[in-house]
A protein has these predicted regions:
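Post-cleavage N-terminal segment of exported redox proteins
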Residues: 1-36, 58, 74-77, 98-106, ...
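Sequence/structural segment immediately N-terminal to covalent heme-attachment motifs in c-type
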Residues: 34-54, 60-68, 160-164, 174-204, ...
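Active-site-proximal structural scaffolding
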Residues: 123, 179, 192, 227, ...
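Active-site substrate-binding loop specific to GH73 endo-beta-N-acetylglucosaminidase modules
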Residues: 61-72, 201-261
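Axial heme c-ligation environment in periplasmic c-type cytochrome domains
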Residues: 73-89, 94, 100-125, 145-148, ...
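C-type cytochrome heme c attachment motif
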Residues: 42-54, 77-78, 94-101, 112, ...
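An acidic site on a long C-lobe helix of protein kinase domains
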Residues: 36, 48, 91, 122-126, ...
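Short loop/beta submotifs within extracellular cysteine-rich repeat domains
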Residues: 51, 58-60, 84-87, 97, ...
Length: 452
């Protein structure tokens, strides 16, 4: 997802330091149901701190997760209250400075991989609750992850002084008096702890987001490539996307990772599983209200019908559906679909509600950039496991059996069938994504021109 200088992290988005938002001290256990600790736990989940600060050992917040960036590998730190290996010696002021200004207890600068420009928007009350939680509500771990060692000149942390002058706006979130309390709550969560813009907003050559809020221009939440995935635009776009879903669909998606027509995949699946499923329905509703407004025409009413629904309803009568049902398909791509995809996603491309995502009218299918779509076909993806929907349904990868030509033909067929209106995919695009796949998600080229 990069030739430009951008801070892009693996896994739900540049959260390398949501956890320094965790610079809490002390390893003593808090009293059961302590309201401040529980509030901090809720906020830490809203910030998805655990995703980046839990490594191969699977010890929460003990760090050790290697994250690839254009500048080298960053290893997440231990943010448990262990005094030697973690953040147990941080005072509340030091914790807040790390979270808001990107400065460690020893005075060294943090890399912008940690989204401290977003966390700077936190209120003092929320900052305090986070500190108390990481001081008293997290089990200490003595694990010592290897230090981050970026090559020169990126190893010179003092360079972040200049970066901060360009991209760090100090001060908490300032409510918009012209908007409702719910809208402002949603903006606070999206711009702050949720740091949605760190994945969904394109970056400049210096690695900073081009806009940190809707007030700073149309780049905000306009979509960006991140670690081999396309974080889609969350703005009111020409092609139907999340911002044009009804409120209930947005809430359901953030709560369970699936709706009647689509499902979370890639890093977003992790965000739902570790973060948004735990948010209150009121906060999820506030997020939906805010997102529906970003990029929307002035005075536009909130969407009440998912635009994908009409496409899905008409898909069964489409020419592609008729030919697939009859087995009279034309073209290699349609044949690949019939032999590999039809059983789950059906001849109509409508899938099955909350189980197999519909391909008809799907915003991922219709995206201008097919990177995510190619990656899903090559390496597969899984839905999140949540309290409401515990089954982590998964699609297997087909990279082991389909050639680049196969995948290109398949996706070109899918992107022009059942009412979809997207451009073709080339074998070169597939080859590029296949080559960039991480070792954890291999999709080797088939040994020959295999046909399923």
């Amino acid at each position: 997802m990069k030739a430009v200088v951008a801070w892009r992290l693996r896994g739900a988005g540049l959260v390398l330091f949501c956890a320094l938002a965790l610079l809490a001290g002390g390893a003593s256990a808090a009293a059961p149901n302590d309201p401040t600790v529980e509030r901090g736990r809720y906020l830490a989940r809203a910030g998805d701190c655990v995703s980046c600060h839990t490594g191969p050992s699977n010890v929460p917040f003990a760090g050790g997760l290697p994250m690839a960036t254009p500048f080298g590998t960053i290893v997440s730190s231990n943010i448990t209250p262990d005094k030697a290996a973690g953040i147990g010696d941080y005072s509340e002021a030091e914790f807040a400075r790390a979270l808001r200004e990107g400065v460690r207890r020893d005075g060294k600068r943090l890399y912008p991989a940690m989204p401290y420009p977003s966390f700077a928007k936190l209120s003092d009350a929320d900052m305090h609750a986070l500190y108390v939680y990481f001081q008293q509500g997290v089990a200490a771990s003595a694990a010592k992850p290897p230090p981050t060692d970026l090559p020169w000149p990126f190893s010179m942390r003092w360079l972040m002084l200049g970066w901060n002058m360009l991209y760090l706006d100090k001060g908490p979130y300032q409510p918009d008096s012209a908007r409702s309390a719910e809208w402002n709550r949603g903006a606070y969560l999206v711009q702050g702890l949720g740091h949605c813009g760190d994945c969904h907003t394109p970056r400049s050559l210096a690695g900073g987001v081009k806009a940190a809020s809707e007030r700073q221009g149309d780049s905000y939440l306009a979509g960006a490539l991140l670690d081999g995935w396309l974080a889609q635009s969350l703005r009111h776009a020409t092609r139907p996307g999340a911002a044009q879903w009804p409120r209930d669909d947005l809430v359901a998606y953030l709560q369970t990772g699936r709706t009647a027509h689509t499902a979370a995949f890639g890093p977003m699946s992790q965000v739902v599983q570790n973060s948004t499923q735990y948010l209150s329905r009121e906060d999820l509703g506030a997020i939906a209200t805010y997102l529906q407004s970003v990029g929307a025409p002035a005075g536009a009413p909130a969407p009440t019908v998912n635009p994908q629904a009409a496409v899905v309803a008409a898909a069964a009568q489409s020419p592609a559906a008729s030919k697939l049902r009859a087995g009279t398909v034309e073209g290699a791509g349609a044949m690949v679909y019939l032999n590999n995809c039809n059983a789950c996603h059906r001849s109509s491309g409508t899938g099955a509600d909350t189980v197999f995502p519909a391909l008809a009218g799907n915003s991922v299918i219709n995206a201008k950039d097919p990177t995510s779509l190619i990656r899903i076909v090559l390496a597969g993806s899984a839905m999140p496991s949540t309290e409401q929907r515990p089954a982590a349904l998964a699609m297997p990868g087909f990279g082991w059996r389909l050639t680049d030509d196969d995948v290109a033909g398949l996706l070109s067929f899918v992107r022009t069938s059942w009412g979809n209106q997207a451009g073709p995919v080339s074998p070169a695009q597939v080859a590029k994504v296949r080559k960039a796949l991480p070792a954890a998600a291999p999709a080797p080229s088939p040994p020959g021109r295999s046909r399923p």
